[in-house]
A protein has these predicted regions:
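C-terminal lobe/tail of nucleotide-utilizing enzymes
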Residues: 1, 162-166, 174-243
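Pre-Walker A (Motif I) flank of P-loop NTPase domains
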Residues: 2-6
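Walker A/P-loop NTP-binding active-site region of P-loop NTPases
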Residues: 7-65, 133-137
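Conserved catalytic network of the ASCE P-loop NTPase/AAA+ motor domain
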Residues: 29-30, 50-52, 111-114, 161-165, ...
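Conserved nucleotide-binding/hydrolysis micro-motifs of P-loop NTPases
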Residues: 41-44, 62-65, 125-128, 175-179, ...
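Short secondary-structure boundary/capping segments
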Residues: 51-53, 134-140, 186-187, 214-218
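Glycine-rich nucleotide/cofactor/substrate-binding loop typically near the N-terminus or early
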Residues: 53-83
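Phosphate/Mg2+-binding loops and adjacent switch elements
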Residues: 80-178, 182-185
Length: 243
């Protein structure tokens, strides 16, 4: 389809990582150069499977990118500032927003790799991802306002995420109330941010199995209302995966 950036998003435990890996493997088989990464601190990526298939694998380690960002700021500041001024810089670097900026910039650098390869991003659970999207919008507005010294990857980030020809978000859920409601909220936030989402995946569907267990059959029956809800939210662009 020509997409350069593919996200898997949704609640924790719905199968985002597995799906992201499967997408990366399929793209590789189709001849694409693929970079698979995760923003999830839990980091469940199967590195061996991906690397053996020729996929570049990485993760955004928050502690690592924070230290790298601090060192970059210190290095630049030391070129022009006095020791007294550097104390103020160190105080600023202790601010919680420093970590947000560091993670955001690392995220922008990963997405920028779409210049040369297809980037598949396994995201952290919904709340963490929404904070990242909000940071993207805020940072973009600040860049436009100040015209400051900003990395090209940051300047290009939001336009790229909003470009339907380049970016696709696959919302992943389970056929249950809480995951579907969280996914619906995520869809609304993506729409507010102007980021394209067409496809949904409903994982672990008992209703697609031939179970004869009475409890599981009752659970499978209860799934149908949530599968119908996803069909409506996705306008029919939903894939179901059996348990």
């Amino acid at each position: 389809s020509g997409k350069r950036v593919v996200f898997t998003m949704g609640k924790g435990g719905v199968g985002k990582t597995t799906l992201a890996t499967e997408i990366a493997l399929k793209l590789t088989k189709l001849g694409a150069k693929v970079h698979l990464t995760t923003t999830d601190p839990a980091n469940h990526l199967n590195y061996n499977l991906a690397v053996q298939a020729g996929i570049t694998v990485s993760r955004i380690d928050e502690a690592e990118v924070l230290e790298a960002y601090k060192n970059e700021v210190r290095s630049k500041a030391a070129e022009t500032m006095t020791a007294e001024d550097m104390e103020y810089i160190e105080e600023d670097l202790r601010s919680p927003c420093t970590q947000e900026i560091a993670v955001f910039r690392a995220f922008a650098e990963i997405v920028d790799k779409a210049e040369n390869e297809v980037v598949v991003i396994d995201t952290a659970p919904t709340g963490h991802t929404l904070l990242l999207l909000d940071a993207t919008e805020s940072y973009h507005k600040e860049v436009q306002r100040t015209h400051g010294d900003t990395p090209a990857s940051v300047r290009k980030l939001l336009p790229r995420l909003r470009n339907q020809q380049e970016t696709e978000v696959v919302i992943v859920t389970l056929p249950e109330a809480t995951p579907v409601f969280e996914a619906e909220r995520l869809q609304m936030d993506l729409q507010r941010a102007g980021i394209n989402n067409k496809w949904w995946v409903v994982n672990a569907c008992l209703s697609l199995t031939d179970t004869e267990n009475s409890f599981l059959r009752a659970k499978a029956q209860n799934e149908l209302i949530w599968i119908k809800k996803v069909e409506e939210l996705s306008k029919g662009n939903a894939a179901l995966i059996a348990w």
